[in-house]
Amino acid sequence: MNVFLLSAAVVLFSIGVMHSVVAEWTGERRLVWRITQLTLFDSSHAKDLLAKRIARLAWHLTSLIWCGTAAVLAYIAFVEASESIIVIVRILSVVFLLHAALSLAIVRGKHGSWLSFLIVSVCSALGTMAF
């Protein structure tokens, strides 16, 4: 068992669940709701209603892809590594390093997601060395 990859999977799955579940009570109401309340949107107009639904869909699809990626990392943590698996995990490590960097830069450190994504990235990278 690769503890680093399993750790990355647990952190990433937690991010995904928190992003969707907690967002239903706080984040979506505080962020997505505000965006959809801008005067750009007219709730009586069908296209604006569709835009609101798409914003909400994108929010939850993001959570779904993180949970799916966590499942892949958890699976890989329990199988024998091949060269292909190592390359895939290294790619994921870079992707989550970019998640961390963009989150840190764009929100200027005011949202803690950058640290969680950095943990996923580092654990994934270390996981490729532990095979």
Each model region followed by its residue ranges:
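Alpha-helical transmembrane segments and their membrane-interface exit regions
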Residues: 14, 36, 98, 121-128
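Transmembrane alpha-helical segments of integral membrane proteins
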Residues: 70-76, 94-103
